[in-house]
Amino acid sequence: MSETWEALRKKARSTENSIDVKLVSLNKLTASSHGGFDIDEKTVSSRQTSFKTVTTEIEGLIEQLTNINDDMNDVAGAQSSASWANNPAIQHTLRRHREILRDYGSEYRRARDNVDQVLQRELLLSSSNENRNNPILNNRARGYDMYLKENDHINACDRLLDEQLEMAMSTKENMARQGINLRGISTRLHHISKKYPAINNLMQKIKTKKQKNTLILAAVISSCLIFTIFWIIN
């Protein structure tokens, strides 16, 4: 199973590198923004096409990396009794890959929202430039500007929700990690009890004695209650 782990680890690193390259390409769409008013619709349309292509590719890679992390977690959990799986470095690697995935998700959403806002403004400016002499279309452009401001508020709310979701995912990951540790402890105790029958026998005797003491205590309490009730009646 260690071979499977190494294969998944290499695949995770390769996917992370691909996401990193795509994020650079996405951020370049913002860096290449004109920032002025001499923008034509053809240029904006081309940039929007590139934006859709890059975001689709990044979302696919993030989903792929999520599945790889889940597979790594399953492999480590299934082999919690193996010596290599108990190595602290394995748990550190799992935690590090989850942190990288979470960081990539945050960075992608931030870059996506920024580029989307820039492209929407450029589209508005390009429409305004072409229809500057048309008062009806100018009024429509002002309506678009109000829409963009409202969209900025919505995006701000989305970012707050993303932060809350990230906190929830972090809590889920911590619980999953604790579950793996508990399964490992349970497995080791099971192996110890099989390896050392004397310990297993001692645990069984302790359990039997506790049950016997519980029965004796229950009998004494019942007798006292019966005697008390009988004494009250008479």
Curated annotation (Swiss-Prot):
Give me the Cytoplasmic side stretches, as residue ranges. 1-212
Q: Cite the InterPro entries for this sequence.
A: Golgi_SNAP_su1
Highest taxon of source = Eukaryota
| GO CC terms of this entry | cis-Golgi network; Golgi medial cisterna; Golgi membrane; SNARE complex
- Report if keyword tRNA-binding is assigned: no
Q: Which residues form a coiled coil?
A: 54-121
Q: Where in the cell is it found?
A: Golgi apparatus membrane
Please classify the protein's predominant subcellular localization into one broad category. Answer: Golgi
Q: Knockout consequence?
A: Reduction in brood size at adulthood. Abnormal tail structure, and loss of the T-cell derived rays, R7-R9, of the male-specific sensory rays, but ray sensory function remains intact. Combined with ykt-6 knock-down causes reduced seam cell leading to loss of ray phenotype. At cellular level, reduced expression of Golgi-resident proteins like mannosidase II, and more so in combination with ykt-6 knock-down.
> Example GO molecular function term?
SNAP receptor activity
Q: Keywords, A to Z?
A: Coiled coil, ER-Golgi transport, Golgi apparatus, Membrane, Protein transport, Receptor, Transmembrane, Transmembrane helix, Transport
Output the GO biological process annotations, alphabetical, semicolon-separated: endoplasmic reticulum to Golgi vesicle-mediated transport; inter-Golgi cisterna vesicle-mediated transport; protein transport; vesicle fusion
Question: For this UniProt entry, which segments traverse the membrane?
Answer: 213-233
Q: How does it assemble?
A: Component of several multiprotein Golgi SNARE complexes.
Record's function text: Involved in transport from the ER to the Golgi apparatus as well as in intra-Golgi transport. It belongs to a super-family of proteins called t-SNAREs or soluble NSF (N-ethylmaleimide-sensitive factor) attachment protein receptor. Cooperates with ykt-6 for proper expression of Golgi-resident proteins. Required along with ykt-6 for normal embryonic development, seam cell division or differentiation, and ray formation.
UniProt record similarity statement: Belongs to the GOSR1 family.
Please identify the protein, giving its name as recorded. Answer: Golgi SNAP receptor complex member 1
